[in-house]
Amino acid sequence: SVGYERPLLPELDLKIQAGEKWVVTGFNGIGKTTLLKTLIGELPPLQGSVCRFETLRITYFSQTLSWPDPKQSALALFSDCYPRKTLQELRFLLAQCRISHELATRPLDTLSGGEQARVKLCLALQQESNLLILDEPTQHLDEWVKKALKEALQRYSGAILLVCHEADFYANWVEHQLSLRSLVR
């Protein structure tokens, strides 16, 4: 079971196979983010265990917009993360996520919520992984960016575990739904 001091959810048996697309649904405060944090190892399970294959490579997109150095620009952040890429390659990666040169050179803490979310998503989508865990990735995004994200996730060959309140975002491509509401007594 997962939680902080007391269980938020009962014991759960969840197996995510390679390439499967899952969505976790439930009302605010039910434990969706706590479940994700337990799955990635940020929180220990209160009871039971989380088993991961050695080949598992997780990319986690948190709904919180925090940065190691909020005064750093997106371009500097990407340069730190990908030191072998040229400035031109980094600008191209950012441009693919609709992050203009002007936005890419501003301090991260001066960007709007939507702009920061685009930087975080762009960073997450560059990482090599076989499981994407996304906590409310559509929050702060305009419709164009949501559409582009949806298309990118549909093309992603690895497994996805998504927390999202927008059924129209995942309705046509997610294969499995875990409704936490049905688990709570």
Regions found by a protein language model. Give the residues of each.
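ABC ATP-binding cassette signature C-motif
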Residues: 1-185
